[in-house]
Swiss-Prot record:
The chain crosses the membrane at residues 249-269. It comes from Pongo abelii. Residues 33-131 form a coiled coil. GO terms for molecular function: SNAP receptor activity; SNARE binding. The lineage of its organism: Eukaryota, Metazoa, Chordata, Craniata, Vertebrata. This is Syntaxin-12.
Length: 276
């Protein structure tokens, strides 16, 4: 398995600014979250080799690059989520609800992926510190330097000179070990800085979730307001229909009464003319 940097997780694209819509940002964020999860599993697998026979400078270098690349991917996703929150809302209430559900699901997935990634980051940091502690405990530099100072006081024979040369070689090896320790300490400082970056992302995510809650309240208020208007309109239509029906009924009664009156008047007139 390769433990190289996260090049395959990078999203190629033009260097110039791009106008992105809601769907494209959602798709990019979803892909990034999946890649963060995949990289976390890869880091965890590499971490299991630290402190074993498979441990090497190359492994540690690749692990550091992979971890840092994943951290950058998380920061990129965080910025995309901020951009997502700045997009104008659609006019349709149903579309607003759909977008809100998509954003909720996306932020939940991102939070879960970040939790797993940060847990692995901290475990890698612990293992690196344990490895440095073991290396320092096994270092012979202090004792050998003390022996070297004693030998520098006097060496009267060729045997003492050869012994001194041998000790110089051992000291040189130990200094190389210490150089590796310094490199690991630098890597740990970078790792801890990346962990702090993830902490900041969590804070930003919490703020976005809070804003999302305010947005949900606003949408629900708009929905309730729309429902009230619909109910009022329905009630008014029902009243209008009732009054219209009542008016028609009165009109029918009036027409019927007028018809009866006309008939009666007609009969009276007919009877009058008939008697004459």
């Amino acid at each position: 398995m390769s433990y190289g940097p996260l090049d395959m997780y990078r999203n190629p694209g033009p260097s110039g600014p791009q106008l992105r819509d809601f769907s494209s940002i959602i798709q990019t964020c979803s892909g990034n979250i999946q890649r963060i999860s995949q990289a976390t599993a890869q880091i965890k697998n590499s971490m299991s080799q630290l402190g074993t026979k498979q441990d090497s400078s190359k492994l540690q270098e690749n692990l550091q690059q992979l971890q840092h690349s994943t951290n950058q991917l998380a920061k990129e996703t965080n910025e995309l989520l901020k951009e997502l929150g700045s997009l104008p809302l659609p006019l349709s209430t149903s579309e607003q609800r759909q977008q809100r559900l998509q954003k909720e699901r996306l932020m939940n997935d991102f939070s879960a992926a970040l939790n797993n990634f940060q847990a692995v980051q901290r475990r890698v940091s612990e293992k690196e510190k344990e490895s440095i502690a073991r290396a320092r405990a096994g270092s012979r530099l202090s004792a050998e330097e003390r022996q070297r100072e004693e030998q520098l006081v006097s060496f009267d024979s060729h045997e003492e000179w050869n012994q001194m040369q041998s000790q110089d070689d051992e000291v040189a090896i130990t200094e190389q070990d210490l150089e590796l320790i310094k490199e690991r300490e630098t890597a740990i400082r970078q790792l801890e800085a990346d962990i702090l970056d993830v902490n900041q992302i969590f804070k930003d995510l919490a703020m976005m979730i809070h804003d999302q809650g305010d947005l949900i309240d606003s949408i629900e208020a708009n929905v309730e307001s729309s429902e009230v208007h619909v109910e009022r309109a329905t009630e008014q239509l029902q009243r209008a229909a009732y009054y219209q029906k009542k008016s028609r009924k009165k009109m029918c009664i009036l027409v019927l009464v007028l018809s009866v009156i006309i008939v009666i008047l007609g009969l009276i007139i007919w009877l009058v003319y008939k008697t004459k």
